[in-house]
Curated annotation (Swiss-Prot):
Lineage: Bacteria, Pseudomonadati, Pseudomonadota, Gammaproteobacteria, Pasteurellales
Gene name of this polypeptide: def
EC number: 3.5.1.88
Molecular function per GO: metal ion binding; peptide deformylase activity
Extent of the signal sequence: none
Pfam families, per database record: Pep_deformylase (PF01327)
Protein name: Peptide deformylase
Catalytic activity: N-terminal N-formyl-L-methionyl-[peptide] + H2O = N-terminal L-methionyl-[peptide] + formate
Function summary: Removes the formyl group from the N-terminal Met of newly synthesized proteins. Requires at least a dipeptide for an efficient rate of reaction. N-terminal L-methionine is a prerequisite for activity but the enzyme has broad specificity at other positions.
Required co-factors: Fe(2+)
GO BP of this protein: co-translational protein modification; translation
Sequence positions that bind Fe cation: 91, 133, 137
Enzyme class: hydrolase
Cited CDD domains: Pep_deformylase
InterPro entries on file: Peptide_deformylase, Peptide_deformylase_sf
Length: 170
């Protein structure tokens, strides 16, 4: 397995809309394995392929971080949702920042697993929020897009400054 490079906002590649996976094969399973490896190393609970510059509809999730309840969502689609909720969300592509995002309390999705088998999943709580967050990434949306223009601009400026500082240290 390999650690993948996580794109950081305002990288324009985060705005690319991911394409559906045509065939779940060994190459896709390797991407999934590398995404889980990266997600755990970065201490995240979810990762969309878009965040690692792979523009296919693939998501990995483990909200508990135990590696016992891993979810692979290939070509995920929300087929039902209800209720209203929201929390201060964080994101590996927006390190050090959090923001409130309104979400559906419960979602039902259909997706393919790592073997290409279709399944349906009903989720609530943190898992439902994480699924919606990661599907947003596949659609070219980051949580900063839900914030006011002023907050988004401040976030962008701070992240660009941080990136410049890190580049000078290399």
């Amino acid at each position: 397995m390999a650690r993948l490079n996580v794109l950081v906002y305002p990288d324009e590649r985060l705005k690319i809309i991911a394409k559906p996976v045509v065939e779940v094969n060994d190459e896709i399973r390797e991407i999934v394995d590398n995404m889980f490896e990266t997600m755990y190393l970065e201490e995240g609970i979810g990762l969309a392929a878009t965040q690692v510059n792979i523009h296919q509809r693939i998501i990995t999730i483990d909200v508990e971080g135990t590696k016992e309840n891993q979810y692979v969502l290939i070509n995920p689609e929300i087929i039902d949702s209800c209720g209203e909720t929201g929390i201060e969300e964080g994101c590996l592509s927006l390190p050090g920042f959090r923001g409130f995002v309104p979400r559906k309390e419960k979602v039902t999705i259909k997706a393919l697993d790592r073997h290409g088998e279709e399944y349906t999943l009903s989720a609530e709580g943190l898992l439902a929020i994480c699924i919606q967050h990661e599907i947003d990434h596949l659609n070219g949306i980051v949580f900063a897009d839900y914030l006011s223009p002023l907050k988004r601009q401040r976030m962008k400026e701070k992240l660009l400054k941080l990136q410049k500082q890190l580049a000078r240290q290399k």
